[in-house]
Regions:
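Alpha-helical segment of the N-proximal tetratricopeptide repeat
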Residues: 6-31
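Structural signature of alpha-solenoid helical repeat junctions
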Residues: 4, 37, 44, 105-112
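"A position-specific structural signal for the A-helix of alpha-solenoid helical repeats
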Residues: 11, 44, 112-115, 119
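Alpha-helical junction/boundary sensor with strong preference for TPR arrays
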Residues: 36-37, 68-72, 76, 143-145
Length: 147
């Protein structure tokens, strides 16, 4: 379970968001009661909010998601092999709006943080906040700065 939703349901939500079916994802996510405990769930809520044009809610959910993965990153020891995999992954990133899975959140909070920040920059671009988007992208490694 992640944020009180079974992982199989979260995989289904990621798939429907990936197909562009935000309406179905919104229904599967249910209400927003309680604290969010999963960056993936927060990012799914953000993507649904952005699809509805509620960019403030999308930003809020993505900030929660970033906070969750950044806290996880500080709790994990540095791993040279993981850094090498991250460097390789940065060269083949999916589109900025590609859903983040709960598994990726656990396996690589660093890559998850990069993807969430790119997602936030894309939300800012959709909202007409180009300067905010540029500032978010500037926080990323050079390889990850394009949308």
């Amino acid at each position: 379970m992640s944020n009180r939703l079974p992982r199989a349901l979260l995989a289904d939500i990621a798939a429907v968001i990936g197909s562009g079916d935000h309406a179905s994802a919104l229904m599967r996510l249910g209400d927003e009661s309680g604290p969010e405990a999963s960056a993936a769930v927060s990012s799914y809520r953000a993507q649904c909010a952005a699809a509805l044009g509620d960019f403030d809610a999308a930003e809020r959910h993505l900030r929660v998601a970033l906070d969750l993965v950044e806290r996880r990153m500080t709790a994990l020891p540095a791993d040279e092999a993981a850094r090498a995999r991250l460097a390789a992954a940065l060269t083949i990133l999916p589109p900025a709006d590609a859903p983040v899975t709960p598994t990726l959140e656990v396996i690589s909070p660093e890559l998850t943080a990069v993807r969430l920040r790119r997602m936030l920059a894309a939300v800012f671009m959709k909202a007409g906040r180009e300067l905010d988007a540029e500032m978010e992208l500037a926080l990323l490694p050079v390889e990850a700065r394009s949308l």
